[in-house]
Amino acid sequence: MRMYRLFIAACLILTFSNIGFTQQPKARRGGQEQNTKGKGRGGGGQAMGSAKKMNLDPIANGNCVMGMPTDHSITASIVLEKGTEAYVEYSTKSGEYKQRTSSFVAGAESPMEILINNLSSNSQYFYRLKYKLPNSTAFIATNESWFSTQKKSGTSFSFGVQGDSHPEREGKMFHPMLYKQTLDSVAAYKPDFYFMMGDDFNIDRFLSNPSLNKSAIKGSYQLQRKYLGNMGANPPLFLVNGNHEQSAKYLLDGTDTNVAVIAGNARKKYFPLPAPDAFYSGDKDTVEHVGLLKDYYAFEWGNALFVVLDPYWHSDVAVDNQPGSQEKQGKKDQWKITIGDAQYNWLKTTLEKSKAKFKFVFAHHVMGTGRGGVERAPFFEWGGKSPNGAQQFGQYRPGWALPIHQLMVKNKVTIFFQGHDHIYAQQSLDGVIYQSVPNPADDTHTAFNKEAYTSGKILPNSGFLHVSVGQKEVKVEYVRSYFKQENLAQETTERHVYTVK
């Protein structure tokens, strides 16, 4: 009975109490903006509720996260007690479940990845998990959830994006109940998938105590599963590597006990991430003790191309923060920071070959470090200039055709999404929108690093971005999250919407 209660509390249930939703405002065409001030429950798509502490029990039996959707398959990562028998049943019609996977028995407490294959493309599926605990004769069915296979070109769809969640910074820029509300709001919008922009698994604080690395890093990833197992049961997740994950080349030392290896393996263990195949392109190189990194990748969906970049696994130096180091970012030689030749050539080929009308590029931040958006774009391998203004791209990146920004301009990238700065900022440079994505659970509602932004629409935390992709235009909506209370500043509740053609 206790296990069943845990399952009900934390498995695939989407709880919509404590949330308020309204009809989304219609954005004007032609790239114009529309701002709407939220007014309590019913204003601006906000997530409301009481600031009650969230109970974080161990990951519940049946906790499920979806990933790696294709035109014919999807992968479910499921936590099950050892000896539990289970299967997934599904159908294109709600409540019918005419198809099912083979039964499987959990061999350990670690998540199991189950491939749901031979699906129809451009289709919505409804599914539920059924499982039978050891020494039990009855199967337990989870609530119904859903997913979509690849949308064909010309079909409208939506996706979501959140910035750095930083669950280790509770009281400073994270509140567990606000995070839950944001994720519940995401599920209610029903995007086809959801991007997390990095700094969701902070490993920095464990670097000074190697004896704690494995258990501590495992705990960081388990913590996110407790939240994402609810929301993630609907939209599949795509992760972007951040600086605080410390999944980084500079830490490699040839052993299987260093932080980068442990973090890289935990990332793949707890979340189903894309590897190069017939549907996804990406990083084909392997790292000793980790294998495929699954760090950068690309795919097409509907009228759009999605590209995820990563400098951390490909730079010989610490890209951003190196715990214990007193070196300031401004004194670093950022020509040493790179996505590497292989990733650059892959990016160039991917952008040039795609015929998608809309192209979206994701990275934790411009160059993986610093603050600001378009303010950072002119420099180093991103824009070609050194800090003194000298154009030195050819000297430092021989063989590269163009700096990354110019490559995006030439290939008509629609939006570049980044996290890291803990702020909402929409800017434009040479026709490319630079979109900084806000924290999803900052109950202080601060516009961190605002001073680094000299242009654009700037708003404080918190919430997520809901992006609707149509045949002719893209609509981006900043869906705000806050607790229902009095005297909130307008900039805390203001919903920002813009369109791109």
What is each model feature region?
Residues 21-50:
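Disordered, low-complexity segments in secreted/periplasmic proteins that are enriched in proline
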